[in-house]
Amino acid sequence: MKCLLIATGQHVPTWVAQGFAEYHRRLSYWLPLELVEIEPSMRGKNHDPQRAIEDEGRRVMAALPKQPYAVTLDVKGKPLNSEQLAQRMEHWRGLGRNLVFLIGGPEGHSQEVLNISNERWSLGPLTLPHMLVRLIVVEQLYRAATILTNHPYHRGK
């Protein structure tokens, strides 16, 4: 199974890149994850948000492997606690398909991307910078892996 994190945005702040690298390294023992960065559309005072969403959506679609199981990060998705995410991860690994997590740009995902999603996952009602979401996602995937292996990292319940 191949696992991708497709994230719109490049040139992340150093502290995000460092945090991502640390959790990516830790996660690699349980779930090899490849980060694919999608070039964001140009934004300025006269930019058209819908056009940006559609352009980024086309780039995301082009980056997808064949027949992926797509989990889209979406504010309207299902919120999961850490234990629920661990259960979902166990389910996803059992599917035998390429697993893809999709993080959109500042305005979100195109309808085309939402339409191919098998699941939508919400990190909650907070508004988060999309660059920070990649760090949160990789940490939560690592936490889920540690729950599944009874590693002491997760100290819930």
Curated annotation (Swiss-Prot):
InterPro entries: Alpha/beta_knot_MTases (IPR029028), RlmH-like (IPR003742), tRNA_m1G_MTases_N (IPR029026). It is found in: Cytoplasm. S-adenosyl-L-methionine binds at residues 73, 104, 123-128. GO terms for cellular component: cytoplasm. GO terms for molecular function: rRNA (pseudouridine-N3-)-methyltransferase activity. It catalyses: pseudouridine(1915) in 23S rRNA + S-adenosyl-L-methionine = N(3)-methylpseudouridine(1915) in 23S rRNA + S-adenosyl-L-homocysteine + H(+). CDD domains: RlmH-like (cd18081). Its EC number is 2.1.1.177. Pfam families: SPOUT_MTase. Keywords: Cytoplasm, Methyltransferase, rRNA processing, S-adenosyl-L-methionine, Transferase. The keyword Transferase applies. The keyword Signal does not apply. It is an enzyme of class 2 (transferase). Homodimer. Belongs to the RNA methyltransferase RlmH family. Specifically methylates the pseudouridine at position 1915 (m3Psi1915) in 23S rRNA. This is Ribosomal RNA large subunit methyltransferase H.
